[in-house]
């Protein structure tokens, strides 16, 4: 069984709350499929890091996380403490640009047992399999256009 290394960056706010549960889910799935996961935790991209260092990321951030198989990122932004342009430009958009994460791909499927808010023309509910699509969003340009 090969090991997969995951860089874990909780960030701020809800990220710190949900990351432990997300890791539990990944661990359970990995056991089910015979995958060995190793989680490396990083404290940057957070208010705490910014308060101590005056920036969101260390100079060698890409070297620290670049060799991992995946990055598991919680949340960025705490407008009461750090202006959005600093937290976004200082971390999240850096990750997206440096690792060429230009697409935000979101599957949308109607699952069994879920009543869809989208109905047929006659008003009857849609059934599983009738809604199966992907939403594709550009992940780096919207906010970053003025800074290119």
What are these language model-derived features?
Residues 1-13, 31, 46-147:
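Anion-binding alpha/beta catalytic cores of soluble intermediary-metabolism enzymes, centered on
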């Amino acid at each position: 069984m090969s090991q997969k290394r995951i860089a874990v960056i909780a960030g701020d706010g809800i990220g710190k709350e949900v990351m432990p549960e997300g890791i539990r889910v990944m661990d359970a799935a990995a056991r089910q499929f015979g995958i060995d996961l190793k989680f490396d935790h990083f404290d940057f991209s957070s208010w705490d890091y910014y308060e101590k260092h005056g920036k969101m990321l260390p100079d060698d951030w890409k070297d620290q996380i670049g060799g991992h198989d995946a990055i598991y990122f919680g949340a960025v932004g705490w407008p009461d403490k750090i202006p959005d342009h600093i937290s976004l430009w200082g971390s999240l958009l850096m990750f997206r640009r440096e690792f060429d994460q230009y697409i935000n791909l979101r599957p949308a499927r109607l699952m069994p047992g879920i009543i869809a808010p989208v109905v047929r023309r006659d008003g009857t509910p849609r059934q599983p399999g009738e809604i199966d699509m992907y939403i594709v969003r550009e992940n780096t340009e919207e906010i970053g256009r003025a800074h290119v």
